[in-house]
Amino acid sequence: MNMGDTVFMFVATVMVMLMTPGLALFYGGMVRSKNVLSTTMHSYSAMAIVSIQWIVIGYSLSFGPDWHGLIGTLDWFGLNGVTYVPNPDYSSTIPHNLFMMFQLMFAILTPALISGAFAERMRFSAFLIFILLWTTIVYNPVAHWVWGVGGWLRELGALDFAGGNVVHITSGVAGLVLAIFLGKRKNINGTSPHHLPFTMLGAGLLWFGWFGFNVGSALSLNDVALTAFINTNIAAAASALTWMLSEWFFQSKPTAMGAACGAVSGLVAITPACGFVTPFSALLIGAIGGVLCFGAVFFLKTKFGYDDTLDAFGCHGIGGTWGGIATGLFATTAVNGDGANGLFYGNAALLFKQLVAIGATYAFTIIMTYAIIKAINFFLPVRVDEHEEHMGLDISMHGEKAYEYTERVN
């Protein structure tokens, strides 16, 4: 065990934990004032439910002894055998239970990200059931495929440094499925974010926490971690700039929300690649990611007519997909000897492996998410009724208001 690495991972874990409250602010500022508490409750509920699920079965299903490359066994049920003694399969320099806690923060954040797609219209009780089932049936298997010892995508050689597939594609695609299943919100013409300073503050906390998310995925304070640190920042900066420039060109003015969404999109795009590419490649990945995610939010969503409330798919699904492809293009063993060279360094096979991983994640997530929400809806209506939606979910679902001084309802 290395004390320096252990302290480093303690700090990284706490930083990633901060991302979920940051996401609550980021999403909360974008919805109408009558739905801000219900939106933030989604993130905090994920912290509670997934923490318990992870301790009981989730960690074992994700990282436990392999079963046919598909999922972990329940040998580590209730953290049986998961102690402070390092597990060299994952890291020989930090306690095994610290690695478990670091990965828990990823598992918490992922279903919270999904909630942006169906904000303002999903019944809270249905959401709680969905979190538990989705984490168990979708997140845990995909995490094992990509990161677990023996997982089939790991054995294939697909690369995902910090969760492009595991976190962002799964959450973005699941969000799209739910947005389509629940249908559009009522009376949304002319609505606007109720508190953009919340969103800007949330974006700042996400940017800060993302250093723990990406850099901590090195699991050691080494040269790869420092490269991931640089790459994370430059990709966010480049994406924020290209999103703003895209807004300026297509909509006449750059906006504060555009800057925030652009930064987050760049952070998403660099997530799978941050420990495998050079800083200049990270700049390109972020810059292109900003343009692609802007296009998904302002053109793709309009063309197909789905109501992805806070653009979970546009930012996370598209950003994660681009990041996975970009890893297959820009990865180089000069940055990380444990990785592989991508297409631009003479190895077309890596790009093929990345595409297989992305395709498998899309297919599995779409099928399982639809099955889960369809099953829940059979027993419990997942969408609030029209009166509850008009009243606002803060009152109809939670019996409280964020702002007692205002009577405005839009």
Over which residues does each language-model region extend?
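Glycine- and aromatic-enriched membrane alpha-helices
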Residues: 1-410
